[in-house]
Regions:
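Short alpha-helical segments that sit at the start of domains
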Residues: 1-22, 26-29, 93
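Short helix-coil junctions and helix-kink-helix linkers
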Residues: 37-47
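Short, hydrophobic-biased segments on the C-terminal half of alpha helices
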Residues: 53-57
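Short beta-strand "wing" residues that participate in macromolecule-binding interfaces
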Residues: 67
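Short acidic, hydrophobic short linear motifs in intrinsically disordered regions
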Residues: 29-39
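Short, cationic-aromatic polyanion-contact patches
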Residues: 70-89
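Glycine-centered, phosphate/nucleic-acid-interacting loop/turn motifs that mediate DNA/RNA or nucleotide
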Residues: 63
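Amphipathic alpha-helical dimerization/coiled-coil segments
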Residues: 86-124
Length: 124
């Protein structure tokens, strides 16, 4: 059986995946310092502030985290609530309309999936 989080590490590196999981666990926008404290709690080898800041900035540049200016620093929050959401965002970002068209074509081949997709669209 696959270890929980393996899907995320397929999309990102191990440290990036750990940062994203910590941001999900926070449940609200966080500063670099707040996430650093969360990551370092119970950890024998402490991460440096600059390491976490660099990783969070790279994740924001990749579109995985959203960055909001607050005072002299930033607040960060995940753009998706799970690894599937991140994967879909990446596919849509990389392939655009073609990815959406293929998704709809796949949904058309299974009436249950098509109904679910329609229901989800109506909820938005």
């Amino acid at each position: 059986m696959a270890k929980r989080g393996d899907e995320l590490e397929k999309l990102l590196g191990p440290l990036e995946a750990e940062v994203v999981r910590a941001a999900w666990a926070a449940g609200e926008p966080v500063t670099v310092r707040q996430l650093l404290e969360r990551l370092n709690s119970g950890r024998s080898q402490q991460l440096a502030y600059t390491t976490v800041m660099t990783v969070m900035n790279r994740l924001a540049d990749k579109g995985v985290l959203r960055r909001h200016k607050q005072g002299r620093g930033y607040l960060y929050e995940p753009v998706a609530s799970d690894s599937a959401g991140l994967a879909v965002r990446g596919v849509v970002r990389d392939f655009g309309d073609a990815a959406i068209a293929h998704l709809v074509d796949e949904a058309k081949s299974d009436p249950k999936v098509l109904k679910r997709l329609q229901r989800l669209l109506e909820e938005e």
